[in-house]
């Protein structure tokens, strides 16, 4: 379950992996897992009178960190995904799942009033009608259905899952890391607001400026002209 201790450890691991030589991260459960994650640790939800999903809730913290993390994060899913864990993987950049995986949003089983940020994290990719069905029924959907409605990027057989995901991560890792980081941030900002305010625009422009002033940008141009594979170094 997504206990505070588990999420603290996960956030620390992500912080430790935020190094220039790391280009892509895979979020996964142990191989052979029947349950990818059971979602919130129910024992840690507060009693009546307190918001169970406040701004500082561990789930809110990890979803923000995943969304704002400067490197692509791939969720490699084997087993069933429940509740808050579904939102957590929806916050990642790509989701690759085994064909036997299932996905459930279960707050209404517990009477939990899911918050606006969490709903937004789901509707940004899945669409309102799909999210309504998932939440209103709390029924699991198959990986095949999740792929068909745009929740997943790929569905593969379980025995091929790790190799397929590693190949995807390796492919991403060969690209320009600074450009990927700024585009990920652009997509996050655009996904969170209907309009972009002037401060955000200037900040993004500054990030883009740092990319096209970088050695990697020049290396990419040179490699294209010279018809060779670029060697990106991250500065």
Which residues does each predicted region cover?
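A structural preference for short, pocket-lining loop segments at secondary-structure junctions
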Residues: 5-50, 65-75, 94, 98-102, ...
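A short acidic, glycine-rich active-site loop
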Residues: 46-60, 206
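Helix-loop "lid/cap" segments that line or gate small-molecule binding pockets
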Residues: 134-135, 186, 190-192, 206-212
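Well-ordered beta-strand positions
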Residues: 93-94, 133, 137-139, 145, ...
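CoA-thioester-processing core
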Residues: 62, 66, 76, 82-135, ...
């Amino acid at each position: 379950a997504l206990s505070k201790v588990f999420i603290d450890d996960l956030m620390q691991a992500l912080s430790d992996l935020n190094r220039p030589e790391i280009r892509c991260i895979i979020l996964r459960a142990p191989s052979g897992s029947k349950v990818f994650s059971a979602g919130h640790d129910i024992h840690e939800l507060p009693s009546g009178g307190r918001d169970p999903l406040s701004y500082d809730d561990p789930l809110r913290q990890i979803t923000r960190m995943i969304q704002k993390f400067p490197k692509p994060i791939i969720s490699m899913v084997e087993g069933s995904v429940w509740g808050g864990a579904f939102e957590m993987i929806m916050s990642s950049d790509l989701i690759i799942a085994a064909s036997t995986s299932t996905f459930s949003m279960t707050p209404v089983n517990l009477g939990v009033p899911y918050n606006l940020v969490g709903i937004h994290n789901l509707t940004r990719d899945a669409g309102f009608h799909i999210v309504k069905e998932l939440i209103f029924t709390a029924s699991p959907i198959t990986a095949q259905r999740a792929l068909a409605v745009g929740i997943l990027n790929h569905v593969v057989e379980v025995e091929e899952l790790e190799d397929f995901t590693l190949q995807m991560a390796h492919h991403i890792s060969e690209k320009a890391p600074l450009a990927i980081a700024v585009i990920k941030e652009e997509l996050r900002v655009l996904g969170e607001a209907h309009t972009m305010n002037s401060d955000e625009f200037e900040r993004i422009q500054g990030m883009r400026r740092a990319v096209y002033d970088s050695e990697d940008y020049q290396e990419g141009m040179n490699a294209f002209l010279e018809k060779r594979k670029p060697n990106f170094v991250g500065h």
